[in-house]
From Swiss-Prot:
NCBIfam families: PRK04199.1-4
SUPFAM superfamilies: Ribosomal protein L16p/L10e
Protein's UniProt name: Large ribosomal subunit protein uL16
Similarity section: Belongs to the universal ribosomal protein uL16 family.
Entries under InterPro entries matching the protein: Ribosomal_uL16 (IPR047873), Ribosomal_uL16_arc (IPR022981), Ribosomal_uL16_CS_euk_arc (IPR018255), Ribosomal_uL16_dom (IPR016180), Ribosomal_uL16_euk_arch (IPR001197), Ribosomal_uL16_sf (IPR036920)
Taxonomic lineage: Archaea, Nanobdellota, Candidatus Nanoarchaeia, Nanoarchaeales, Nanoarchaeaceae
Keyword Thylakoid: no
Domain of life the protein comes from: Archaea
Assigned keywords, A-Z: Ribonucleoprotein, Ribosomal protein
Organism annotation: Nanoarchaeum equitans (strain Kin4-M)
Gene Ontology cellular-component annotations: ribonucleoprotein complex; ribosome
Single GO MF annotation: structural constituent of ribosome
Length: 186
């Protein structure tokens, strides 16, 4: 069974590798997979973010990369929690980062006799495109939840803590008033 390589190989930032085009002659990266994140805006889509009273966000504490299937897992989980506690029309959930970066993997042959005849070592060791990742920098918001009901702020903070536990590296939760920008003390 094919497995994903452990993410500690990729989570440090590198030069973005992103040139994908619909026309074949302009496409520098052949065989790049599409992103696994299907929706970036969920909930009440008719209201602008500035029309809500409160914003809860996950803010990165360090520069790093996140695989797109980790973001998709967080999206599904947080959206399910928000729908069950707040209802479909009482929040706006936005994923603020798009997985542009395409990470590569050089398959390592080993474990059987004659592997040295098959692999070329480090000659032309660029690797093949395996998936997409988000490159996020310190202080940037990965996702935001907009809401009006202050009594649900502790629930939303808990949802962000659960989402944070599924991500690599470190984040902090921020809940602020949209109009004034003042942080809420919970």
């Amino acid at each position: 069974m094919a497995r994903l390589r452990r993410w500690h190989c990729y989570r440090k930032l590198e030069v973005p590798y992103t040139r994908v085009s619909r026309s074949k002659n302009k496409n520098y990266i052949p065989g790049a997979k599409p992103t696994m994140v299907r929706l970036f805006h969920m909930g009440e889509l008719t209201r602008n973010p500035s029309e809500w009273q409160y914003e809860a966000s996950l803010v990165a504490k360090e520069n790093h990369q996140i695989r797109d299937n980790a973001i998709e897992a967080i999206r599904v989980m947080v959206n399910k929690y928000l729908e069950s506690t707040l209802g479909k029309k009482r929040y706006l959930f936005i994923i603020r980062k798009y997985p542009h970066h395409i990470y590569r993997e050089k398959p390592v042959v080993g474990g059987y006799a004659g592997a040295d005849r098959i692999s070329q070592g480090m000659r032309l060791s660029f690797g093949r495109p395996k998936g997409r990742a988000v490159q996020i920098y310190e202080g940037e918001k990965l996702l935001s939840i907009f809401f009006d009901d202050i009594t649900k702020a502790k629930d939303i903070k808990y949802f962000l803590q659960v989402a944070r536990s599924k991500l690599p590296w470190r984040y902090r939760e921020e809940i602020v008033e949209v109009k004034s920008g003042k942080p809420l003390a919970l």
